[in-house]
Amino acid sequence: ALLDDWRQQYGSFGKARIARTNTRQIGSIFFGGGTPSLFKPQHLARLLEEVPHQGAEITLEVNPGTAEYHRFEDYQDAGINRLSLGAQSFSNAQLARLGRVHQQDETISAVAKARQAGFSNINLDIMWGLPGQSVAEALQDLRQAIQLQPQHISWYQLTIEPKTEFAGRPPIL
């Protein structure tokens, strides 16, 4: 029932937006903000039915620690053509400091599994300015991301948001 409500709201929003902008096609759709890969592929397919998206880049954000690799092919069948993997760092110590549920090897495995499933458009999210991270360590993370040869790398500075664990207990940078 919740999915049907979302689908109706998403479809109504998308159709209204397209009508206002006089655009016939959407160029990019991004399912992000946490762990949208926990959605079943058929649910994503139903959401995508609501808007014209032929030829669009459709991204699904995936946490390497919770990725269900057996679903990667099903995501493609649902219309997802780009995966964005939240690596954040290739240092297991940094990942632990950040409270991440994955380790470096899981990111490397997720990239390999995505390629095996047929994804040819992969993004890696990594961060710099992490607690105690040196410039050399940040650059090492970037080098490791480049070694995996993704089509895109998003290299973000750590941002401490209000009402998060780090806001109440800021890391020493």
Each model region followed by its residue ranges:
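Ala/Thr-enriched low-complexity intrinsically disordered regions
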Residues: A16-T23
